[in-house]
């Protein structure tokens, strides 16, 4: 039988999808990308912000139509939306057969069996259980890079965020298990490991009594075949001197950090439940750039948080201008039910949020272009992603670019290159967020 898997949301969700795909493949199920030939459809959902929730619901409704028409034998919904609205999904969309919570992915085979037998049920596990069964993942990212989810859940409880309710408390995956998983990925041809979690920098504190991300990274550096290790979702206040030292000493560790700071006004930061002040953020950024001069820093911001004044928005704009982050994304605030921020007074109109978002991104575009122009003439190591269709050109990424969120470099060459190859490239031109180069 053929299964179509629709994976929505973040890279952490994608890891969950790959785990379930591995379990299904071990049973002999065949995967397909064509909904018209699928016997079973599984939708791994997201509900982090309003748009993600809407996308998940729309996908469920579209696939439910196929089930209603008799084209699909079973429809299963998993992920954050399933955990949060499990009963409502079954009540309001009767075409859905099974709903799996975020810690019940090891029961995907049971869910498929039950769905094919005509059962309709919710399958849950303890919200604070370690959700990922030890199984061989079916990597879906092309084979040359893969995400390594090092922890689940979050203890921060930011006032705008629903994640602790749908993912549980923070719990680290044991280091030995992660090293074994990374070794298996390397044996499959993976060359870049991208460490992800709701927060990576707190890794190990629950298991080992101290933050141990630096120890994990050193252990991963010893795996043959791994060329790059990239770290995402670092909380600024949790970055340790030991982690900085590992980044300086280990050549496999990309000089790249993703630091979601969300805002720069102290009042807004406090209302968000964040644990840093503006000055502390400045100090952390300056320290990282002093210790690792070629580091690439990515951040994300939220604009239009309840009570954000025009003056506080201008302060954020000034902060972005002064800090000159290499990479930056901006979300408009999305009120999520059952979060403290959703009930706060002075909610901002959507039009104002979007205008402020556009202003920040216009400023960041100028910063990004200036930084891209500064790269012209430099020689860089590039991981090849693939060939540009119908052209003698390839596209790749430098250490400064995480897949799917950052820029690319376009390389003109007649040589034959493969995805996952590394090549030395001279930068010859700059676009808004991307580079142009020639093979050396």
Predicted regions and their residues:
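Proteins enriched for Cys/Gly/acidic motifs involved in redox and nucleic-acid/cofactor modification
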Residues: 1-203, 242, 253, 257, ...
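Conserved SAM/AdoMet-binding glycine-rich loop
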Residues: 75-77, 84, 187-311, 321
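Conserved beta-strand core positions
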Residues: 3, 40-41, 146, 193, ...
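Short glycine-enriched, charge-decorated loop/helix-capping segments at active-site entrances
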Residues: 47-48, 167-168, 207-210, 270-276, ...
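Short strand-connecting beta-turns/loops that link adjacent beta-strands
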Residues: 36-37, 155, 252, 264, ...
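Terminal RNA-binding accessory module
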Residues: 343-440
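Conserved, mostly hydrophobic/aromatic
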Residues: 178, 195, 231, 259, ...
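Active-site proximal loops enriched in glycine and acidic residues that flank catalytic Cys/His/Asp
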Residues: 197, 233, 261-263, 299-303, ...
């Amino acid at each position: 039988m053929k299964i179509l898997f629709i994976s929505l949301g973040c890279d952490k969700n994608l890891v969950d999808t790959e785990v379930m795909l591995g379990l299904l493949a071990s049973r002999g199920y065949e995967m397909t990308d064509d909904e018209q030939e699928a016997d079973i459809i599984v939708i791994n959902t997201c509900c982090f912000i309003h748009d993600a929730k809407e996308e998940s619901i729309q996908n469920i409704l579209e696939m439910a139509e196929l089930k209603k028409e008799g084209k699909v034998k079973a429809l299963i919904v998993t992920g954050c939306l399933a955990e949060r609205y499990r009963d409502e999904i079954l009540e309001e969309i009767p075409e859905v057969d099974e709903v799996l919570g975020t810690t019940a992915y090891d029961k995907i085979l049971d869910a498929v069996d039950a769905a094919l037998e005509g059962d309709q049920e919710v399958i849950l596990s303890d919200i604070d259980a370690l959700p990922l069964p030890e199984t061989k993942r079916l990597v879906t990212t092309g084979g040359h890079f893969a995400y390594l989810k090092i922890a689940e859940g979050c203890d921060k409880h930011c006032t705008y965020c629903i994640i602790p309710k749908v993912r549980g408390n923070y719990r680290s995956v044991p280091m030995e298990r992660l090293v074994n998983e990374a070794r298996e990925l390397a044996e499959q041809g993976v060359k870049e490991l991208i460490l992800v979690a709701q927060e990576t920098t707190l890794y190990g504190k629950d298991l080992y009594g101290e933050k141990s991300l630096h120890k994990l990274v050193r252990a991963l550096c010893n795996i043959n075949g791994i060329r790059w290790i990239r770290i995402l979702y670092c909380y600024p206040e949790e970055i340790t001197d030991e982690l900085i030292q590992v980044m300086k000493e280990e050549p496999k560790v990309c000089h790249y950090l993703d630091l979601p700071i969300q805002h720069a006004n102290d009042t807004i930061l406090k209302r968000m439940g964040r644990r840093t002040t503006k000055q502390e953020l400045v100090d952390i950024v300056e320290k990282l750039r002093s210790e690792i001069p070629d580091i690439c820093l990515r951040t994300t911001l939220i604009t239009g948080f309840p009570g954000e004044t025009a003056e506080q928005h201008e302060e954020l704009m000034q902060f972005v201008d002064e800090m000159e982050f290499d990479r930056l994304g901006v979300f408009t605030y999305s009120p999520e039910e059952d979060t403290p921020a959703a009930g706060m007074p002075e909610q901002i109109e959507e039009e104002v949020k979007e205008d402020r978002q556009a202003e920040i991104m216009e400023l960041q575009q100028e910063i990004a272009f200036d930084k891209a122009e500064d790269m012209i003439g430099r020689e860089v190591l590039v991981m090849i992603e693939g060939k540009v269709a119908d052209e003698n050109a390839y596209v790749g990424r430098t250490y400064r670019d995480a897949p799917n969120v950052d820029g690319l470099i376009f390389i003109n060459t007649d040589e034959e290159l493969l995805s996952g190859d590394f090549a030395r490239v001279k930068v010859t031109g700059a676009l808004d967020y991307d580079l142009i180069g020639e093979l050396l």
